[in-house]
């Protein structure tokens, strides 16, 4: 509340009115980083999960000039699915993995889809509608072993499972 009513300076500016908001943002960045095993400078603030997913998926695709493939699941959050549809329209092929009957994507399942042409794998950590929690560390290792980047939407996992981005490999 104080940053809406009294200390509303632009935290990105060098003037004195911006000092308190800038300090608050830095403290928030440090707090979040410590919760997920990241460095403060690795934390970026967006308007929410949808914008973050778009930054990750589309940003990677825009630098993927040779249009290599992306793999995701058929049961991702719509933010991821819509971002994948957008990159498909740009000529980037996307494969949609189907889960097993427990709504689970195994390492073996990803191994069946991934090739050395895969550029990005995106799998939601915890699905808020289905209740499934994916083995992100294992899936990330498969992606990295094939030279692919790995993205996970972990918004629904926060507070339910321990998250350490370095341990997970994301």
Where are these regions (language model features)?
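Pyridoxal 5′-phosphate
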Residues: 1-170
